[in-house]
C-alpha cells in the first residue's frame, strides 16, 4: 500500500515537471563597451518612457545543480532551470526499485557568443535642419524628435523557439557590454536634448539622429532533454544535440547617436 502511494506521488511530481514549456539563457564574459562621445543618454527626456528589461541569470537550487552536473551538455536555459528548481524527487527508501525516463521536451540549451560589435548608426530616426544662409550670425539648434519612432531588432536567421533564443542572446549581450539592451524600444515625439550645435553664418545645418544597436554573433545549442530516475539516483540525459549559427541586432535602450553637418 505504501509502495502504491509512493508511485502515485512520484507520478504527480513528474507530470508537474513535464507540464512546463521552454525558454532561454546565456554564457558570456563581462567586457564593458565604451560609448563614443556622440552617444547620449536621453532616457529622462524620452516622452515615451520605456520599462527596463528585467533579466537576470536564475540561480539553480542545490537539487538543480546536482542534476545539471550529470548532463554531458551544458545547460543555461533559465526556464529549464526554473522548472528543475520548482520540482523535487525525494530519495525515499521506497524508490530503490524505481526506474523511469521522462521526456522533458526539446530545448534551446545554451548560447555561446563569438562576437559582439556596436553599430552606432543602426537606424536613422530624425533630422533637424536650419537654413542660415541668409543669417547675420551663428544659429544654434538642438535635437527635437519630430515623429515617434519604434526601433526593432531581431534574429538574423529563423530558428526554433525564437523567444527562448532571443532571451539567451540578450542575457549574454547585456552581461558582455553592461549596456541597457532590448529588442524593441520607442523614442516619443517631442523628445528633446539641451546640447546645442552651431550653424555658421551663410550655412545649412543638419543634425542627424541615429538609434544605436549591438550586433551579436554566436551559436545556439538544442537538445532533447530526459530526466532519468534509477532508484535514488537522478540525472539529466540530453540526446540528438544540434547546433546552429545565429546572429541578432539588439537596440540600445534610452541612448541616441548624434551627427552634425554644416554645408554652404
Enumerate the predicted regions with their spans.
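Sec-dependent N-terminal signal peptides of Gram-positive bacterial secreted proteins and lipoproteins
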Residues: 1-31
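A short, flexible low-complexity segment enriched in Lys/Arg and Gly/Pro that occurs
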Residues: 1-7, 135-139, 143
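Short acidic DE-rich linear segments
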Residues: 2-9, 27, 151, 158, ...
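Short N-terminal segments immediately surrounding and downstream of signal-peptide cleavage
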Residues: 27-48
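Core pore-forming/fusogenic effector modules of secreted, proteolytically activated toxins
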Residues: 46-141, 180-264
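Membrane-inserting effector segments that mediate pore formation, membrane fusion
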Residues: 138-189
Amino acid at each position: 500500500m505504501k509502495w502504491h502511494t509512493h508511485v502515485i506521488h512520484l507520478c504527480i511530481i513528474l507530470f508537474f515537471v513535464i507540464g512546463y514549456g521552454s525558454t532561454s539563457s546565456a554564457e558570456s564574459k563581462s567586457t564593458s563597451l565604451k560609448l563614443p562621445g556622440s552617444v547620449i543618454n536621453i532616457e529622462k527626456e524620452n516622452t515615451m518612457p520605456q520599462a527596463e528589461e528585467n533579466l537576470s541569470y536564475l540561480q539553480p537550487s542545490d537539487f538543480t545543480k546536482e542534476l545539471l552536473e550529470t548532463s554531458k551538455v551544458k545547460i543555461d536555459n533559465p526556464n529549464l532551470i526554473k522548472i528543475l528548481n520548482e520540482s523535487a524527487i525525494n530519495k525515499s527508501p521506497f524508490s530503490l526499485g524505481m526506474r523511469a525516463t521522462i521526456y522533458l521536451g526539446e530545448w534551446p540549451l545554451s548560447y555561446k557568443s563569438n562576437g559582439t560589435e556596436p553599430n552606432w548608426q543602426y537606424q536613422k530616426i530624425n533630422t533637424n535642419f536650419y537654413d542660415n544662409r541668409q543669417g547675420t550670425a551663428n544659429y544654434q539648434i538642438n535635437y527635437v524628435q519630430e515623429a515617434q519612432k519604434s526601433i526593432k531588432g531581431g534574429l538574423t536567421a529563423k530558428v526554433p523557439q525564437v523567444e527562448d533564443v532571443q532571451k539567451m542572446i540578450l542575457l549574454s549581450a547585456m552581461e558582455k557590454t553592461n549596456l541597457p539592451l532590448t529588442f524593441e524600444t520607442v523614442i516619443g515625439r517631442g523628445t528633446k536634448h539641451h546640447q546645442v550645435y552651431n550653424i555658421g553664418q551663410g550655412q545649412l545645418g543638419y543634425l542627424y539622429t541615429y538609434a544605436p544597436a549591438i550586433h551579436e554573433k554566436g551559436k545556439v545549442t538544442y537538445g532533447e532533454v530526459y530526466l532519468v530516475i534509477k532508484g535514488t539516483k537522478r540525472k539529466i540525459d540530453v540526446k540528438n544535440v544540434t547546433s546552429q549559427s545565429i546572429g541578432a541586432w539588439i537596440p540600445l535602450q534610452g541612448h541616441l547617436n548624434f551627427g552634425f553637418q554644416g554645408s554652404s
